[in-house]
Amino acid sequence: MNKYEELLQDASDDNVRVYESFDLNGDNEVVEKIDGLYMDGNIALDKDLKTTAERACVLAEELGHHYTSNGNIIDMNSLHNRKQERQARLHGYNRMIGLYGIISAFKAGCQNAFEIAEHLHITEDYLQECIKCYREKYGVYTTIDNYVIYFIPNLAVGEHIDI
């Protein structure tokens, strides 16, 4: 079962209905394309999402809204709404990537964003957004188990070895 299928199963287990080919943007050129939308236990994914990785990344964030958001948060001028949006995204990043995912990519020998994204079955854009979010959350670096994960100046992982 791939990550997207796991997310669909989790949604089903939590009684969240997922509409996988919804026309969220119409035929018009839109300034800000909407890839997914959560409302009252329902998730709509845009029909133009091409890959399983794209669908999984969007679904993870929309499930984040199910678990962390309440009310209508469409208006991003509201600080409260922006905080809820950030929480939903962070939930998705932790679900799809997480610090252990970054370590897993390091252990697998991934050398660049493309390889990390492929290893984690996500898009490169999603990875970059996650790193930016983690940089804001953790600062220059964070430690977990025997590893140091640097976010500034670039993503890097080091393993602490006792001598």
Regions found by a protein language model. Give the residues of each.
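Active-site hotspot residues in diverse enzymes, especially metal/ion-binding acidic/histidine motifs
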Residues: 1-58, 63-163
